[in-house]
């Protein structure tokens, strides 16, 4: 979540958080990303040390991978690859270093549908998809006019996948505040209670490797092959 936070806001409190101070300095985005990558590298090493002893850690409490340490290592490497690719225009050397570390680590990456990082099916539990909760229980999530303009303008077939089509689509202009039942007439997101909440899929990893290969990093294949694999 924090890499999305810094991508949106830039500098954020990070290195000094949780150390007992009510006033915390902001870290630069560069230092935050360097910390992210270093911490992921350390996490992979810690998991690697443990994975030689046991393949399951607290499976009853792991709603993502049922305690499978090897799968967590794949996710950590995949997340490292994501962050490395994000900084390639700001620091190509740092991006290349960590992208290649992620790809070449023997634990591997998320490279199949079955390995996707997702919440909702682990540990014998079934969570409610939070987007469904926000949509139905909070009753304030509807199709925005901006995305409708894109989808309708390009006659994009995905509109009926992203949203519930009842007698067409009706979008609300972003920034308009309505109350009570006023939202009910607008189109709802097409999400179900038992839909998994994905953190990362194999398709994203393929596209990340394609971008890395395009930048000249050693990703173990060509940009075109990885790109086509992501589409498939």
Q: Which residues does each PLM region occupy?
A:
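Structured, solvent-exposed acidic/aromatic patches
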Residues: 1-232
């Amino acid at each position: 979540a924090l890499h999305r936070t810094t991508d949106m806001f830039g500098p954020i409190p990070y290195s000094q958080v949780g150390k007992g101070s009510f006033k915390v300095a902001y870290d630069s985005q560069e230092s935050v990303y360097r910390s992210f990558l270093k911490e992921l590298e350390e996490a992979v090493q810690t998991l690697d040390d443990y994975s030689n002893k046991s393949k399951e850690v607290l499976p009853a409490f792991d709603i993502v991978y049922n305690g499978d340490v090897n799968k967590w290592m794949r996710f950590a490497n995949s997340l490292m690859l994501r962050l490395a690719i994000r900084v390639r225009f700001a620091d190509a050397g740092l991006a290349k270093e960590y992208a290649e570390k992620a790809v070449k680590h023997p634990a591997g990456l998320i490279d199949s549908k079955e390995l996707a990082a997702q919440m909702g099916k682990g540990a014998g539990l079934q969570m409610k998809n939070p987007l469904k909760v926000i949509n139905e229980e909070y009753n304030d999530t509807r199709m925005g006019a901006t995305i409708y303009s894109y989808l309708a303008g390009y006659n994009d077939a995905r509109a009926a996948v992203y949203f519930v089509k009842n007698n067409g689509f009706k979008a609300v202009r972003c920034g308009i505040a309505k109350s009570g039942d006023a939202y009910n007439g607008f189109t709802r997101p097409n999400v179900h209670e038992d839909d998994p909440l994905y953190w990362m899929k194999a398709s994203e990893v393929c596209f990340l490797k394609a971008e890395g290969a395009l930048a000249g990093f050693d990703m173990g294949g060509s940009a075109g092959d990885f790109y086509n694999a992501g589409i498939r």
